[in-house]
């Protein structure tokens, strides 16, 4: 079942998404100067492929210290991930707005385990999700494994 589930999730995460969304994801990744492993795009805008309203992203970053934020926010992330912030991205005449959640892959993995008291991660990522940006093939494979774990936990 796991291989089949992984295959289904890999196909789902590879769905086409609007170019401005991919560009926004790449910009988020650039903010952490190489420490981002993946940017996930999910939520109602993924279902509709609309650029209106607030886009939803999860940024997986190797080390939370690499993400540009204040020291107190970094400490808070270690205690209660993810950190969530609002970002805007102007591309041509189009202004995109997004809610951006940030956590490490290990925090994501811990949140998708059966023993986790926080159900928000595995519940959220049991729904459609696209990988809007990945650093490389290894990061993509690891991200798909994390998403498979979320679905298996649900």
Give residue spans per PLM region.
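Short hydrophobic/aromatic beta-strand micro-patches
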Residues: 58-60
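Catalytic core of pol beta-like nucleotidyltransferases
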Residues: 1-35, 40, 46-52, 62-154
């Amino acid at each position: 079942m796991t291989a089949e589930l992984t295959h289904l999730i890999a196909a789902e995460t590879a769905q086409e998404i609007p170019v401005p969304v991919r560009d926004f994801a790449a910009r988020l990744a650039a903010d952490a100067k190489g420490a981002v492993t993946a940017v996930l795009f999910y939520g109602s805008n993924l279902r509709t492929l609309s650029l209106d309203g607030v886009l939803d992203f999860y940024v997986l970053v190797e080390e939370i210290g690499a993400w540009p934020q204040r020291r107190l926010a970094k400490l808070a992330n270690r205690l209660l991930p993810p950190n969530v912030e609002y970002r805007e991205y102007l591309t041509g005449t189009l202004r995109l707005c997004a809610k951006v959640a940030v956590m490490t892959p290990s925090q994501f993995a811990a949140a998708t385990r059966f023993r986790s008291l926080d159900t928000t991660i595995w519940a959220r990522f049991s729904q459609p999700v696209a990988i809007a940006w990945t650093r490389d093939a290894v990061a993509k494979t690891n991200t798909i494994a994390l998403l498979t774990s979320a679905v298996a936990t649900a």
